[in-house]
Regions:
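A generic structural-conservation signal
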Residues: 31, 187, 248-249
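Short beta-strand element of the conserved SAM-dependent methyltransferase core
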Residues: 92-94, 239, 262-263
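GST-like fold's C-terminal all-alpha helical module
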Residues: 122-241
Length: 265
């Protein structure tokens, strides 16, 4: 039986964090969801379901005004909002459905804490806190990246500079960490590595909008990633090749590896 259930829009690299961790530490994670545009036709709940066409109206007892990335009417049960006060996805639940866990790194932590087959969260409270430090730094980067990636067509000079600064600060820290140890937080693989792979792989998708950015006078922020952060690139590609990662990420990074002429070995 699953140890964690997640409802989200799909595909979602942030959900992949929990799935990869589950693969490594032996935790079954159930994921239910749909394309972002379709979530307005779902009842958001511990047991989510698609609504019938005649149920889709603003007078439905669970109709709510969409916020943060969703417009129009959404359908969220009272129990969903009790478990998830911010009403966002991905939304995770314990097996009983009475405890909600939100924010992808917190969901990732939950999987690591439940998992017994492999320790992904440090050998003692100090190592765990160091891992948390990287997760917090990752969150700052990911928040800035989300704003940038959601509106390439209208990115401003100020927004571009903010994203560039966040990128350089985050990547320089990861590069420095990897100069001292084989994994981001130390000698062992941890959820810090998993979070990095998923969020940074998503950021690299800016490459698909190169022409849009050029039309606005901007170059790709990650254009010189290979040369400026070689250890970070090597770490990203190395983890992507591991079965626990590749079965979740699939071909998500293939376009980028092809661009850099990185072969599958």
């Amino acid at each position: 039986m699953y140890k964690l259930k997640i409802f989200s829009y799909l595909p979602n690299p942030r959900v992949w964090k929990a799935l990869i961790a589950g693969n490594i530490c032996g935790v079954e994670v159930e994921v239910i969801g749909d394309k972002p545009a379709n979530l307005g036709t779902w009842l958001w709940d511990f047991n989510p379901k698609m609504l019938n066409e005649d149920e889709l109206n603003p007078d439905h007892k669970y109709a709510r005004v969409g916020k943060r990335g969703f417009s129009g009417v959404l359908y969220k049960t009272d129990s969903f909002l009790k478990a998830h006060p911010f009403g966002t996805v991905p939304a995770a639940f314990n097996p009983e459905g009475n405890i909600g866990i939100f924010e992808s790194n917190s969901i990732l932590r939950a999987v690591a804490r439940v998992g017994k087959e492999f320790n992904l969260y440090g050998q003692d409270p100090y190592e765990a806190s160091r891992i948390d430090s990287f997760l917090d730094a990752n969150l700052v980067f990911a928040r800035e990246a989300q704003v940038y990636m959601l509106d390439y067509d209208n990115v401003s000079e100020e927004g571009y500079e903010r994203m560039t600064a966040a990128y350089e600060f985050y990547l320089s820290g990861i590069e420095s960490a990897l100069e001292e140890s084989p994994y981001i937080a130390g000698a062992d693989l941890s959820i810090a590595d998993i979070s990095f792979v998923c969020d940074f792989s998503q950021f690299l998708r800016e490459g698909h909008y190169e022409d849009v950015l050029k039309d606005k006078g901007f170059s790709l922020i990650a254009e010189k990633f290979k040369d400026e952060y070689p250890k970070t690139l090597k770490h990203l590609i190395s983890l992507n090749k591991r079965k626990e990662f590749s079965t979740v990420l699939g071909t998500y990074l293939d376009w980028y590896k092809s661009k850099l002429q990185i072969t599958r070995k």
